[in-house]
C-alpha cells in the first residue's frame, strides 16, 4: 500500500537448544529431593534463544531453568522471588550433578560422551555461520 520493501537477514548464532538426555536425567534425579518431584519437569522446545544452543550442537550440555523469579526476563521488573531456590537449592542440584558426572573416574561423564552424537563438528559449524552471515 505504501510501496515499501522489507529485507530480513538472518544473523549467525543462537541455534536451537539440544539438551543432553543423560545429563538432564541426572539433574532431574538430583533436583527431585530438593524441589519436590511435582516441581521438576522436562521442558519442551522454547522460543527463547541463547548461545548455549550453538554449543549444544558441538558437545553435550544442559540448560536448566529454575522458576524462582517474578517479572519479565531481561526487564527492569525482573527479580528473584525465592532466594533460597535461586542461590542454594539450584547450586546444590548442579553440584550433585557434577559429582555424578565425575565420580568413580568420571564414569558418568564418559557415558554421556560415549552416547553423544554432535549435530555439527567445528568445521561444519563455522561453515554454517559463514553461510548465514553471507545470506546463503
Feature map (PLM): residue ranges:
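Metal-dependent amide/peptide-bond hydrolase catalytic core
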Residues: 1-136
Amino acid at each position: 500500500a505504501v510501496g515499501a520493501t522489507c529485507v530480513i537477514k538472518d544473523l549467525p548464532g543462537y541455534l536451537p537448544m539440544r539438551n543432553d538426555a543423560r545429563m538432564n536425567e541426572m539433574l532431574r534425579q538430583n533436583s527431585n529431593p530438593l524441589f519436590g518431584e511435582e516441581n521438576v519437569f522436562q521442558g519442551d522446545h522454547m522460543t527463547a534463544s541463547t548461545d548455549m544452543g550453538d554449543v549444544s550442537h558441538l558437545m553435550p550440555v544442559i540448560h536448566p531453568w529454575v522458576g524462582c523469579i517474578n517479572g519479565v526476563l531481561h526487564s527492569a521488573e525482573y527479580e528473584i522471588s525465592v532466594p533460597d531456590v535461586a542461590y542454594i537449592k539450584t547450586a546444590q542440584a548442579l553440584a550433585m550433578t557434577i559429582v555424578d558426572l565425575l565420580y568413580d573416574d568420571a564414569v558418568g561423564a564418559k557415558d554421556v560422551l560415549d552416547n553423544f552424537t554432535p549435530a555439527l563438528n567445528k568445521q561444519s559449524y563455522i561453515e554454517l555461520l559463514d553461510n548465514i552471515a553471507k545470506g546463503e
